[in-house]
């Protein structure tokens, strides 16, 4: 036992010494090229990791106020460059769009979270990624494909509205809006994917639904967890890989679940689902549309269609509850352009300009992925006059850009009206990224949010739980959830009573 402990101690000492030498050499090389400035406090082995706080985007914003719109950090052996200005973002994704089209490849198995070489989110830039992106644009997120699922989206919207009506038909009632939005969004996407409902009343097979909900919950927890082994590979060699084991187990369970869906649809009659459509493509090109590729596409679709939609809708409702004048203006627009004889439809969304302004302003203040998905240059380049070596991780702090007083008037205030008179420029408002690696599901997410938000405003009166404003503190994670679940009081609008009774079959 003593010999083993001595061996482990010697191995750890040697490993730390080697990492220190590597980092020292990299620091010496860095001094020979003009890297973006770094904050003080760099330490051997760990770099700047100890300076990172719980909300990464806010920590990076604080650094940018001292160091400027571009700066660099060391996360262990990894060089990270952070961009925090709209002008530099425009430079990155116009001049260097192809160079920056790569993604950093995780050293651990994150395929069940959408980051893998078979996923359009995480695949390296090249022919394979171009094929995946083309498939997404033409087959998965194509307007005609999404239009074929319109009846599903309307039905799930009606179910949510009916549920709220039954809760509040006697007068103002307390509702957990987060729960309702999660049920709406995940049922929407899973009916499109596989024709199944896994949340709320009338959910499919209880055991299967529970498996899916458990996988979703675990995925959320894993995306919020940090993995020191990715920053310090030596920890993986020494066995400190608890998160990696959890990721591997989650990936295996996700693969088994998705394979079960594929096999079930192979055995059954073809339906209008994304799984059936992809399986038909597999029949024509089996060498390319493997089960692994199809699973990667489905996972990407689930992620693209749920995360942004859930958090954006919840933030939007929180903001308008704190600004009743915005809620009233949106309701008047709906009453004028849609009326009271029917509920708002997706076809109404293009003409509901103020509703769209609310969505844009929500995405500005609370982008669902505040530092976007990281990029990695495939060759050395210069950004803002600084050298950025090949293989650097590049983070774009969209949260900081969206609150930049040089770009936005009164940037910390919720003012949807600002978008009524200004043209949206993608390098200034980029909640879904920019360039060729922008999120392919942005259009679907905005359809989800617009329809849900418009329906909630049109059909119900809303009030806060008390005179106190809704808490707008942010929670932790890759996405930007609220720290506190949104609860509110609602009751049916008298003028919409007849429509609500029809939808609720009462």
From Swiss-Prot:
GO-annotated cellular components: membrane
Class in the EC hierarchy, top level: oxidoreductase
Chemical reaction(s) catalysed: (+)-piperitol + reduced [NADPH--hemoprotein reductase] + O2 = (+)-sesamin + oxidized [NADPH--hemoprotein reductase] + 2 H2O + H(+); (+)-pinoresinol + reduced [NADPH--hemoprotein reductase] + O2 = (+)-piperitol + oxidized [NADPH--hemoprotein reductase] + 2 H2O + H(+)
TM regions (residue ranges): 3-23
GO MF term list: heme binding; iron ion binding; monooxygenase activity; oxidoreductase activity, acting on paired donors, with incorporation or reduction of molecular oxygen
Domain of life of the native organism: Eukaryota
Residues that, per the record, bind heme: 439
Names of required cofactors: heme
Gene3D superfamilies referenced in this protein's UniProt entry, alphabetically: Cytochrome P450
Compartment annotation: Membrane
A Pfam family per the record: p450
Membrane topology field: Single-pass membrane protein
Keyword list, A-Z: Heme, Iron, Membrane, Metal-binding, Monooxygenase, Oxidoreductase, Transmembrane, Transmembrane helix
Record-annotated disulphide pairs: none
Function: Involved in the biosynthesis of (+)-sesamin, a furofuran class lignan. Functions in a dual catalytic mode. Catalyzes the synthesis of (+)-sesamin from (+)- pinoresinol by formation of two successive methylenedioxy bridges on (+)-pinoresinol and (+)-piperitol, respectively.
Recorded family membership: Belongs to the cytochrome P450 family.
Name of the protein described by the UniProt record: (+)-piperitol/(+)-sesamin synthase CYP81Q2
Gene that this sequence comes from: CYP81Q2
